[in-house]
């Protein structure tokens, strides 16, 4: 199985860019045989962007993690939320900032403007969940907005 996850990552990257690579890796590692669709790619993109914003100030706080988990539970249900949060915990151990632009551009090509605005709103909620909107978090959210063709 150890080679399978890397083959999945390579195939995912080839067909779906950086998001596809991450999805391919996790599908092969955890959900071998599962089919990944645009909805799942969107949901994983939210996790990636959340992780980047959470880590922007150099601290990962429980309140921020709880905010993301609650959002996913309310939006996608408890079972799916638990599945995604296991993935989120793994993503949080990685430095994903180098993939930020590619993830945003890929999202930009698949969702409409109002959905992109909702993502920015969600990310500000993540940032504010610890009762402090750190300037570095704002900087990351502005960068995300710019990459998604939203005037910051």
In which residue ranges do the predicted regions lie?
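Small-residue-enriched hydrophobic alpha-helices in membranes
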Residues: 1-152
